[in-house]
Structures are given as structure tokens and as C-alpha cells.
Amino acid sequence: GCHTNSKTKDYHCHKKKPPKTLGPQVKKENIKGVSFLDLKPESVSTNLMRLDYEGFTVWLDCSKRGAVKFQYNAQRDTGNFKRSNTFKLDPKVPEECQQLNGKTYGKNYDRGHLVPANHLDHSKSAIKMTNTMTNILPQAANMNRGAWLMTEEVTECYRDIDELLVVGGVIWGNDPSNDYFVKSHGVKTPDAFWKVIIRGVGSNERAIAWIVPNSAEATRKKTDDYIVSIEEIERVTGEVIPVAGFTKYDKSNPWVIPRGCNKG
């Protein structure tokens, strides 16, 4: 089963340990699918690949050629390895389960990270793995450098205060108007992304959650508009977020960036 370790605060599941390798271990795992923002049923396979990279995990839906969920622990920032400019496919993942190439998207869309490189900058190999295309999806440039970046900066600052559990995912939706990259990359463009950050334990547990639309309107100054309750995340995605009941039902106030936070 899955639980939070009372000493390390690490949320994990007991499974047979895979052999050590420089790349991820590919596992088949059944988890709940994702729903649309309007709660219409979405066609997401229940047979997902779990990819355990160094320091983070991604769940991949072969039918989408892309991820549906990600998770990692963000600990105190002790590193400064730089992000690579190279994006590559994962040789351990079947071709039919991932994008066609690692090239840029264009059309004002970035190669957007689910798990940001900066949060794995303690390890040269881990930060390199974040540029694997299984961790990348088309994100509107304004959103990737705006509201989504702001959620990453909140994580960056608060991980120096508490160890954080970060869980997030993809809301693929059903809007075909932005599916520019089906021919070039084999992947549709998600309609939104979600993220939950959890800190503290027991009565001190706190969490904040966002659903960020994948659009040019999702600028930095609108980040707080996208804060939702964890109950809403669970309702929209079908996920069960590992937080106490008292944390689920009210929207969090914004987590203010602490004065003097080093976002690098």
C-alpha cells in the first residue's frame, strides 16, 4: 500500500525494487484517469506506464503519447547544476507510447516541463532526465513562463522551509483548436494542467492547488485566479490526493513568495 513515512515525510508505495539503472524503470500500473474541466468523461487508458526517473515519477498514457500525472519530493535547494538545452526521447519507452521527436513545437508553444529542471538541480543526471520528452508537453509560452512558472517558484521558495510533496497532472480536454502538433510530434495539446503542493504534517499540514489553463491568458499576474480546492482537483481528475480531510475543502490563500527567496 501507499503511505507517508512518519520520519522522512516521503509519500511512497511499497513495491518490489527494480534493478538499478541510469534510466527509468518502466512499469505498468492502473490508476484512475483524468476528466475534463467540465467533468465530461475523458478517454484515458487505465493501463499506464509508470516511469521512475531519478528524483521524480511520471505516469504515461500510451494512447495519448504523453503523461497524465507526475510526482516528486522537493527538498532544500543544495545544487546549481544547469539545465541542458537538449531534449530527447526515452529509449526505454516504446515508440508508440511517446512523442515522435524532441524538436521545438513553435506556434508560441514551449516544450513545457511537468517536473521542472530547477527542482532537480542537485544532480547532473537528474536534471538531465527532466528534459526527457515523457516529461514535456506543449505549453502556451505565456502560460509556461507565467502562471505555471509561478507555481514552480512557489515550490522553489517553500522547499527551503519544508520538504514538499508535489503532485500534478494533465487535463487533456477535448478542444481540437489547439492541436497543432499531432502531425509533427504525434501529441495533442492539453487544455489545462493541475498541481498540488503539500507541506507539513498532522495539524500543521498545509496544501495549495491550481488548475492552470493552457492558454496565452494564463499570465503570472493571474496565478492566484487559478487556485482551487483539493476537493475540486479530485473531482475533476479522479485522483485521490494524500492530504488530511481538513485540508481538502477550502481553497488555500496564495502562498506569498518569501522576501529574499533565491529562485535559482
Feature names for model-found ranges:
Residues 23-264:
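Domain-level detector for secreted/extracellular nuclease and nuclease-toxin modules, and
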Residues 2-25, 67:
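Post-signal/leader-peptide non-cytosolic segments of secretory proteins
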